[in-house]
């Protein structure tokens, strides 16, 4: 049985049998993996709380026939405790891990840039660097951008004029008055500015005012359209 070591973030867990769990981890070098942590649900488990969601861990993995097995796990950064202590941060963290879980649809596909973005977002939540809602919304848009779904916001996607008046999610960006389609929604300059700031991670803009409800809805709709399924944690926050 061959072994490999990597650093990763625990995205989610699910029960297996009476004492085990399947741990889903986004790793730095091996992409998303699913591995069994044996005995982790026992009171005296050798893993302790190191394999809980939002934990950043160094893991030693044994390759298995159907599922790999976690042999060792050491904490690198305990994001879980400070995030769980603040409900808004906890909600945002759930949005973040659900988003990357959906983006990383193929196991073992290396996603180093996505991994760095994930670490940055969870670290910001744990340190309360910015408003949790803004961190979560910005993460969603930046993760989608890394996956290839960046909205075109500067010029009309039809004619190229720098006269953005509408936004069409299906067309991938803004449209001018003359060329907008029936699905496009009118977008005010301040909404466009805040939406753009989320994508760029411009905290000078995002720290100045809470993310507007209409902008939150744009993030939710953009994610659902390009992932082809809703980000349920985001929908719960926005409801």
UniProtKB/Swiss-Prot annotation:
Signal peptide: none annotated. It comes from the Bacteria. The lineage of its organism: Bacteria, Bacillati, Actinomycetota, Actinomycetes, Bifidobacteriales. Keywords: DNA damage, DNA recombination, DNA repair. GO terms for biological process: DNA recombination; double-strand break repair. Involved in DNA repair and RecF pathway recombination. Belongs to the RecO family. Pfam families: RecO_C, RecO_N. GO terms for cellular component: bacterial nucleoid. This is DNA repair protein RecO. The gene is recO. Coiled coil: none annotated. It comes from Bifidobacterium longum (strain NCC 2705). InterPro entries: ARFGAP/RecO, DNA_rep/recomb_RecO_N, NA-bd_OB-fold, RecO, RecO_C.
């Amino acid at each position: 049985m061959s072994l490999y070591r990597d650093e990763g973030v625990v995205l989610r867990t699910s029960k297996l049998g009476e004492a085990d769990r399947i741990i889903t981890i986004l790793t730095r070098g091996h992409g998303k993996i699913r591995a069994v942590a044996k005995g982790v649900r026992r009171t005296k488990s050798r893993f302790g709380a190191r394999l809980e969601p939002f934990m950043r861990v160094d893991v030693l993995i044994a390759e298995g026939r159907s599922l790999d097995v976690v042999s060792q796990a050491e904490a690198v950064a305990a994001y879980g405790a400070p995030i769980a202590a603040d409900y808004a941060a906890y909600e945002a963290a759930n949005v973040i891990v659900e988003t990357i879980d959906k983006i990383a649809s193929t196991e073992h596909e290396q996603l180093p840039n996505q991994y760095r973005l994930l670490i940055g977002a969870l670290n910001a939540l744990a340190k309360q660097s910015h408003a949790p809602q803004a961190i979560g919304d910005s993460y969603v848009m930046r993760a989608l951008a890394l996956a290839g779904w960046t909205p075109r916001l500067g010029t009309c996607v039809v004619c190229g004029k720098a006269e953005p008046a509408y936004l069409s999610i299906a067309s991938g960006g803004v449209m001018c008055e003359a060329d907008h389609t029936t699905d496009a929604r009118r977008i005010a300059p301040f909404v466009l500015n805040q939406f753009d700031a989320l994508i760029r991670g411009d905290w000078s803009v995002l720290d100045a005012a809470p993310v507007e409800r209409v902008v939150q809805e744009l993030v939710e709709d953009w994610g659902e359209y390009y992932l082809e399924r809703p980000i349920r944690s985001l929908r719960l926050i926005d409801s």
